[in-house]
Amino acid sequence: MKKRYLFPADYMADPSVHVFNGRVYIYPSHDWECNNVNNDSGDEYIMKDYHVLSTDDPMNGEVVDHGKVLDLQDIPWAGRQLWDCDVAEKDGKYYMYFPMKDKCDIFRIGVAIADRPEG
């Protein structure tokens, strides 16, 4: 089986992957380096934004980082930790569903809407 490392510059994990209009879109979680202690509250995870990656050829082509598409600061009820998201298309709109902790540290599910798969 052929393998390839796609994004060496950042801490990204848990991707959802979709093909929209013949292009592969990757929606990973994005963690930031920190020195927080590992505990049951997940304080060691600083996941404060999402990036979208895409490519025409996952094994040989260039992987484009479309940059930050959603940030904790963009979400009024956000507390911390944007976990693994997923995206669905309906009627030409792209819906990103994401779990995160609110200001009371309770997990909630939110949705963001865009006109393009890259945000």
Predicted regions and their residues:
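Carbohydrate-active catalytic/glycan-binding domains of CAZyme proteins
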Residues: 1-119
